[in-house]
Amino acid sequence: MKQIELEDGRSIERDFEKDIEEWKPVTEIEDVSVDLDAEKDQSSQSLNCLSDVIDEAYPIEHIKRADYFKADVQEAMRKEIEKYKSFNAFEEDDDMGQDNVPIRWVVTKHAIDGKNQPLKARLCIRGDLEKDKEFLRSDSPTAGKDTLKLALSIAANEGFTVKNVDIKSAYLQGKDLDREIIVRPPKEAETKKLWRLKKAAYGVLDGGRLFYLRLAEVLTQLGLHKVHSDGALFTFVKEGKLHGFVVSHVDDLLMAGDGVFETEVESKLSEVFEFSKVEKGTFNYCGCSISTEDEKIYLHQHEYVDKLQYIPVKDYVNQSNRCLTQSEMKILRGRIGEVLWLSLITRPDLSFEVNKIAAETTNATLETLKSMNRIIKKAKSIKNTVSFSKLGPMKELVVRVYSDASYNNQDEQIRSTAGTVTLLEHPATESVNAISWKTRKIKRVCRSVKTAETRALDEGLDEAVHIARIIKEIYNGNINLRQPDQLPVIAKTDSKSVWENLHNTRQCEERILRNTIAGIKELMEMGIVKEVDWVPTNLQLADCLTKSCLPAKSETLLKVIHTNHL
C-alpha cells in the first residue's frame, strides 16, 4: 500500500501491485475465472430472439469450474480436443511470445424432454478481443419463419420425406480462415506450443458465416439452386422436376426430397460433412415439433407452450398503475419474445394481443404484467397444430390472402393495425395450407377506415406476390421478373369502399390513396393479382389479427390451419 497526497490536501491509499494484477491481460485458460450465470445474464441481451426462446424452453445447465476435475468433464474435454485434431482445425506453432486470443472452456448439460443429455465441452475463443473485429462480416442467412411453413407445405404436396440433419461441430467444418488467429491451448491439450487456427472455432465472430459459405458452396456443386429471396433455402430441380430442397438454420438442416434427392444430394452431402444425427418421422427443429403421419405433415409447439412460465406479480392494493422495476421489465420483455415466437409459428390467435403489449413496454405497469399472464394462460389453454396436406398439382393452385385493418386502435388511438393471412389453396376443393400470418402496426397515420383497409390490402398483396415468386423459383430453379408466370394471387377484403375503388373507373377521393390504388390496379392488369374480392366480416380470417375478438372468431382461423379446409 502507498499513501498518495492529493491537491486538495487529502490522502488516499492505493495498492499498485493489486491494480496491475487486476488489469493484466489474460493469456492462459487457468487465469479465467468467470461467474457463468452472471455472464449468461449479460450475454443474453445480445442473443437473437430465437436463441433466447429455445434456451428458455430447453434450459442449459452450466457446469462450474470447480467441477472441471471430474471424470465425465475431463472426458468431454478430451473429446472436444480430438474434434479439433480430426477436423484439422489448427497447426502447432512454437511459443515465441506472439499475441494470442484468450480461450476458455464452456461445459454444459442440455436438458431435453426432462432428460439430461451427455455433458458437452466446448473450447470458445474470445472473438470479441480479436484485432480489427469491426471490419469482419459476420452476417449469414437463416431460414425465415414463413420459409419453414412454405417448405413443409411443398413437402406435403409433393410427398417428400422430411428429415432433420445436424452437422457435427459445424464451425470446424466451415471454410478455412483467411486471417491469423493464434491461441494458447488449454492444459488438457498437453502441449507447450501455440495453436494457429485454420478453422473458425466457437466464439470467432464470423464462424457462422464461414460455415454457411462452405455449405452453400457444396450444395451448389451438387446441383442445388439458392433461392434469391431467401439465401437459406436451396432447391434441387432436375430436368424440370423438383426433387427436393434444403433449409438451413446454421448447423440444423431441414431436408425433404424423393429417392433421386436422397441419392444425388443427401448421400453425397454426408461424404463432405460429418453428421451428428439424422432424424425423420417425428423430430424437433428450431424449437418446433415436426411429424409425418398419413401423408400429412404436422407442426406444433406443445412442449414449448408447457414450459412457458407466468410472470410473478406482487399485487399491491391500488398499485395497478405502478411503473415496473428494471428486473420486472426484463422478465416482461423475455415473455413477450417467447410468446411472439409462438404466435409467428403456430398461434396466430395470440398475435394482436402480444404485439399490442410489445408496443406499450415503454410505459408498462403492473397491469401490463397481469395482461401478459392472461395471454400466457390463453396460450396454455389451447393446443393447436398446424397441418400441411397434399393439395394437388402446383400449377392448379393459387395464393390467397386475407387482409383486414382496425382504425386507430394503437398508440393512444393514433396508429392503426393491419393483419394478413396467406394461404396456398386449390380453388376446386377449397383445401388450403397456411403459409404466413402477420399483425403489424401501420407505420403511417391513417385518416380514415378506408385508408387503413387500403394499406392493409397493399401489404397483404406484397406478401402474397412475394410467396408466389418464391414458389416459382423453387420449382423452376430461377426467376424472371419480366415474365411473371407465377401462381395467381387472389385477395379478400371486407371493405366495400376499397373493393369499389378497385373495380370502377372513378378516381379515389382521398389523394393519399390514389397511388396505392393505382399500383394494385396495375398488378391486376398484369395478371399477377388475379382478383380482389369482397368478403363479409364473419368470413374474414384476418379479423382476429387486428383486434381483440371473441374466442369463436380466433377459433375459426385455428380450425382452418389445422383442418386444411376453408
Predicted regions and their residues:
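Retroviral integrase
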Residues: 1-38, 488-496
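Long, low-complexity, charge-biased intrinsically disordered regions
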Residues: 30-566
